[in-house]
Structures are given as C-alpha cells and as structure tokens.
C-alpha cells in the first residue's frame, strides 16, 4: 500500500536542494505538492525557482502548486495556505524545510544575519505549523516534518556556529513542543 498516494503536501523551501528532492520523491508516490518558497527568479549561484521545481514535479502526473512565499511574513503564509486548501481541498502533510544558513562565528556575524536565520528557521517553522493546524486537524493521518537536527548539547556543535545552531535547534524545539501539544489531534510531528 502506498501511504503517500493522493496526500496533499506543503513543502517550504521546496524550489531546490533537499526540499525539491523530497517533493519529487513524494510526487513519484502520488502526492500532490505545494511549493512555498520565495525564489521565483533564478539566482546565478543557486539555480532553481518555484516554477522550475513545479515543472519537474508535474512530470509525475500529480497536482503541483508553486506559491511565492516568504515564511517570515504572516500575511504571505496565511495567503499561501488558503491557496493550497482552495486548490487541493485539504492539507495532509507539512514539511518545514525552508532554512537560512550563515556559518559565521559570533564575533563576525552581523545581527541582521542572526535575525534572518531565526526569523526563517524558528519563527517561520512555527508560523507555518500554526497556520496549517486547522487544516491538519481535519486530515485522517496528518504529519508535520521539520528538517532539523536532533538535540545534541555537546559544546562542539555550538563552538563555531552558535547562531546557526540556535536557529536550527529552534526548529527542533518546535518538534518537541508541537508533538506533545498536537498529540490530542493525532498529528504526528517529527
């Protein structure tokens, strides 16, 4: 039995990289895919847009919905979720993949970059999960998946990239909290 057939999936940061790979794998198993990412114009160093990703995913014969979305902004996330529900009818799976990375040490990292990582990684994950909640509650087998590391409090993981590690662990904290909080709705959070 294919557990992903006819599931409606949202993937943040799905225009390239890991997000696109996950989207293609799910699409190959029959899932409809909504891509929420802010890249609608190709970048010279980072190829791929929501539109090129959608074209790759459509080859699997599933519904695909590319939506330009900056997950730092409530109104954009709310609008995107409304579009997904209008187009697909429901949401079964949310994959929080969008992430900002800056591998500077604390002394060198501008606070603007610190804020960006936390706004996207932690706040964006929280916002997308919270906004999808009413729709996930209606699904028969709802899931939220955050692409974040397991907790490892050994100082070596923080030593060189404290701010980035904090931002990614913020995503992991969402898993811990929401898995317990959403348990009453039978929403699996990993």
Task: Please describe what each predicted stretch is.
Residues 7, 62-63, 90-91, 136-150, ...:
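Active-site loop of short-chain dehydrogenase/reductase
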Residues 15-16:
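Conserved glycine-rich cofactor-binding loop
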Residues 29-52:
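Conserved glycine-rich Rossmann-like NAD(P)H-binding loop of the short-chain dehydrogenase/reductase
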Residues 48, 68-80, 111:
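The beta1-alpha1 cofactor-binding region of Rossmann-like NAD(H)/NADP(H)-dependent oxidoreductases
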Residues 105-116:
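Substrate-binding pocket helix/loop in short-chain dehydrogenase/reductase
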Residues 129-130, 176:
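A short, exposed helix-loop element centered on a Lys and neighboring polar residues
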Residues 137, 145-184:
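Catalytic loop of short-chain dehydrogenase/reductase
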